[in-house]
Amino acid sequence: MIIEQLTINHLEDFHHWISNKQAVAYSLSAFLPERDIEWSRQYLEQITSDQDSWNQVISVDDTNIGFCGLSGISEVNRCAEYFILIGETEHWNKGIGTDAGQFVLDYGFSILGLNRIWLTVSEPNIGAIKSYKKIGFREEGIMREACCRNGIFHSKIVMGLLRKEWLNRSKS
């Protein structure tokens, strides 16, 4: 697995990933309506120029399969939100998301000096929840019925990891 900076050169892959309805089922609401390539270009330009985010592409065997990183990076509060989307579903359940997550946590805590990294995950997304717990995230709360997919409301789980927890985990 290789993780490197996400750029506008990844536009076709990015558009392909967010067009995969299975991959974005529990992702950002912005990805749910079918989007054209121009929308994807504008979105990608926006996130890759955002100084408060760190956006990476995940590659396996010379194939780009998704993206991950940190958004809303706050130097004052020393926290950020973790995100990941593996758009090539044939790479699900192979530990790639877990490995990518560990890489992002290492970067956030070691390089950026963050104190807290957090995320939200849709309650039905069991595979993601297992992966997040495996890399050390803990459940902090529930945002009740915060998401609506296919006319059904479900809750989002707020998870977080503190630097001291990550350091203790790294020692064991």
Model-identified regions with their sequence ranges:
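Conserved active-site tyrosine of GNAT-family acetyltransferases
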Residues: 132, 137, 159
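Terminal substrate-recognition subdomain of acyl/acetyltransferases
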Residues: 152-172
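Conserved acetyl-CoA-binding loop-helix of GNAT-fold acetyltransferases
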Residues: 93-107, 129-134
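A short, well-structured alpha-helix characteristic of acyl/acetyltransferase catalytic modules
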Residues: 1-41, 165-172
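Glycine-rich acetyl-CoA-binding "A-motif" of GNAT/NAT acetyltransferases
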Residues: 63-66, 127, 153
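Conserved GNAT acetyl-CoA-binding A-motif
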Residues: 110-120
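Conserved catalytic-core motifs of GNAT/GCN5-like acyltransferases
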Residues: 118-121, 138-154
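Acetyl-CoA-dependent GNAT
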Residues: 35-90, 162-166
